[in-house]
Amino acid sequence: MAARLCCQLDPARDVLCLRPVGAESCGRPLSWSLGALPPSSPPAVPADDGSHLSLRGLPACAFSSAGPCALRFTSARRMETTVNAPWNLPTTLHKRTLGLSPRSTTWIEEYIKDCVFKDWEESGEELRLKVFVLGGCRHKLVCSPAPCNFFTSA
């Protein structure tokens, strides 16, 4: 069974909320402002590793009070990239992760809104989830003892 996330837009508060699907009731929703730009480097991961949620295959930053790095990246209102075609988005985000020079575009914002700014639930191999992972998160996954795959870990 794949780790599953439910991402919900709260238009009243202009906040994107990420909730683990099937987590214990003690699991808290993660939310952050959509208007804030992402930091240039990943934030420190808090001591709380999220183990109380009994979920593996999630980046350690998924349990940060600021929310996951990759989703915070894709939820920024203003996106910058090095390409001019939507089908190159995953490659573009990976290049941005490596620190290559970006330039402003207009299509990228609409593309991300179409993928993210709706209620959705993800599990397994899915393009939108891959886009989030390629968005720049450098944190280790929460899993043990063997290496895990973000898309297939239970």
Curated annotation (Swiss-Prot):
Record key words, sorted: Activation of host NF-kappa-B by virus, Activator, Apoptosis, Host cytoplasm, Host G2/M cell cycle arrest by virus, Host mitochondrion, Host nucleus, Host-virus interaction, Modulation of host cell cycle by virus, Transcription, Transcription regulation
Subcellular location per the Swiss-Prot or TrEMBL entry: Host cytoplasm; Host nucleus; Host mitochondrion
Database matches in Pfam families: X (PF00739)
Family annotation (InterPro entries): Transactivation_prot_X
PTM description: A fraction may be phosphorylated in insect cells and HepG2 cells, a human hepatoblastoma cell line. Phosphorylated in vitro by host protein kinase C or mitogen-activated protein kinase. N-acetylated in insect cells.
Main location: host cell
Subunit structure: May form homodimer. May interact with host CEBPA, CFLAR, CREB1, DDB1, E4F1, HBXIP, HSPD1/HSP60, NFKBIA, POLR2E and SMAD4. Interacts with host SMC5-SMC6 complex and induces its degradation. Interacts with host TRPC4AP; leading to prevent ubiquitination of TRPC4AP. Interacts with host PLSCR1; this interaction promotes ubiquitination and degradation of HBx and impairs HBx-mediated cell proliferation.
Record-stated family: Belongs to the orthohepadnavirus protein X family.
Name of the protein in its database record: Protein X
Organism encoding this protein: Hepatitis B virus genotype H (isolate United States/LAS2523/2002) (HBV-H)
Gene name per UniProt: X
